[in-house]
Amino acid sequence: MTGHEALRRVRLIQISAGRPPVVATAAALLAERTGAPVETVASLDAALAPGVFQIAAPTRSSQPGQPPDPRVDIQLRPDGSGRLVSGGGRMLYAAASYLVEVLAGGDIGRLEAGISIVPTFAWNRSTYDLFLTQEGRIQRGLDPESYVRQLARWGFTHAEVNALASPMGLETGPKGEVYPMFYTYCPALDQFVSSSLNKGLYPFYYLSANLATLKRNAALARKYGLVPGLTCFEPRSVPEEFFARYPMLRGPRVDHPFRSFRPRYTMTLTHPRVCDHYAEMVTALMREVPDLGFLNVWSNDSGAGFEHTKSLYVGRNGGAYMIREWKDDAEIAKTAGTHVVGFLRLLRDAACAVNPDFRVITRLESF
């Protein structure tokens, strides 16, 4: 008997109440292929009745505090009964696709007793997702849901979701300057939410539209079992209007002088008020999307940079609070590195107050 023949004998697909959204998505895929209805029950029966196929995503983990066990269990019997189980649901849609598109084409064989698949990597994360969140997001005919569905089908577990709603950010510059183009990708936290420090710096309609796009992408990720996350250039420059209001919070110059016609500056991360500003923004974002799972920080390029790091395009520079500029290179580098780590820890701690599994990642080659 082939898997296709066994699937034709499925009469009912069962999922449990309180399941992650991806369980319903995987059930819909199986229902489409089998014609069987989907039933939600209080709990799944351990004994499989003929023709009943169960789909589940238990939150089992290998160790306390660790991510869900990524193991996938697939069982399909000749009478149409079976199970599809993926810890946490991260690989559930990929497993459902694999069952109906690949395994079903062969002999039922080992599927009758059940097989287990342990992915080599528990994380398969898109990095600089050109089509969903970066420059390619504005191409004609792009369907975000089809794209996210394909990510899940390929076995991705995490997806970037922070994208601008418009083709370009609100960064402006002198006539003929190309530098504003560098702000269309990896948008910073302040493109989605504000804090008590920078409230009003960007118009509400702009922030709300961007946040709505982020939340749409996060909902799609959730639907297909992917963990939503962010890739941001941080700390990124802010409009000069901000420093007219708070001149003491000016940080390093971060633009590339070959490409910019005017300097750009970030806030100084050594001032407590700026640290509070970042913590407030992370908290606000987590309040909107509590299951955000990661923040990938890129820096020292595209209008972002850490003060007093040597790889800034105009060289070491920054505010007056971190260290005196006449100190030697080794001492400045050590102090700058300590503050970089402190900033990343600040972001993590603010997010972990909502999602304890949140992770902060950084790209090291630019330093």
Predicted regions and their residues:
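Acidic carboxylate-rich catalytic motifs and surrounding loops in phosphoryl-/glycosyl-chemistry enzymes
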Residues: 41-44, 233, 360-367
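Short helix-loop-beta junction
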Residues: 29-37
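Active-site neighborhood of glycoside hydrolase catalytic domains
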Residues: 273-367
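Feature activates predominantly on carbohydrate-active enzymes
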Residues: 5-6, 10, 14-21, 26-29, ...
